[in-house]
Amino acid sequence: MDKGKSVKSTKKSVGMPPKTPKTDNNANSHVDNEFLILQVNDAVFPIGSYTHSFGLETYIQQKKVTNKESALEYLKANLSSQFLYTEMLSLKLTYESTLQQDLKKILGIEEVIMLSTSPMELRLANQKLGNRFIKTLQAMNELDMGAFFNAYAQTTKDPTHATSYGVFAASLNMELKKALRHYLYAQTSNMVINCVKSVPLSQNDGQKILLSLQSPFNQLIEKTLELDESHLCAASVQNDIKAMQHESLYSRLYMS
């Protein structure tokens, strides 16, 4: 091997900007990404998130979450463990892989998530939400998602909400930190709504919980940006157990 040639080649590759997904900017000239990211994270975006508690219902029925204080502790624990290392991290990784046009890497990330998710209800929930997110975007004919997103949509077998959202955000050149912030808030808001309905809590308590989570939100986003693929799916065993126990609850309001 020519050592001089090898060093020269390496220097060229260092510092190169990531590829940008090829989208027809003119086709989306009428789309305001600021409003679009609000739309896809809104509770009325029809992917069925409201039908899942992801194990929370078990905590409530077992009297582990009974009031505002225990609901807040549950949320902090869940957000800083399973949600961080699976949802937030996979969103970031698929976002970065989309910028690199690396479809194989994205499919590999989704396979790791599927194989690492022990509870059956959580696996099914991930797939349903991911598929529904993709199909809803495709049904919006005025929105040109670009060739890479379309190739991903046709190829993926095990999409999750977070991974498909990461591909979506990168395909439309949205800022990663903004995509993470909106996703984190929207999913936490869903959890709080579930607590308000099921514990139950007052609407005011729900808003107090969301307000008190602002500082942890910023910490979670910064932590996500620091993590790499080796941390993917560092799950909470306790939450997996509760999700499995949910399958045999006598009465259930949620599918997971």
From Swiss-Prot:
GO terms under cellular component: cytoplasm
Annotated localization: Cytoplasm
Q: Which keywords belong to this entry?
A: Chaperone, Cytoplasm, Nickel insertion
Q: State whether keyword Cytoplasm applies.
A: yes
The biased composition feature labelled Basic residues covers 1-11
Q: Which Gene Ontology MF annotations are present?
A: nickel cation binding
Q: Which Pfam families match?
A: UreF (PF01730)
Does Chaperone count among this protein's keywords? yes
Residue numbers spanned by region Disordered = 1-28
Q: What is its main location?
A: cytoplasm
Function as written in the Swiss-Prot or TrEMBL entry:
Required for maturation of urease via the functional incorporation of the urease nickel metallocenter.
Task: Cite the PANTHER family for this sequence.
Answer: UREASE ACCESSORY PROTEIN F
What does the subunit comment say? UreH, UreF and UreG form a complex that acts as a GTP-hydrolysis-dependent molecular chaperone, activating the urease apoprotein by helping to assemble the nickel containing metallocenter of UreC. The UreE protein probably delivers the nickel.
- Which family, according to the similarity comment? Belongs to the UreF family.
This protein is called: Urease accessory protein UreF
Question: Which gene name does the record give?
Answer: ureF
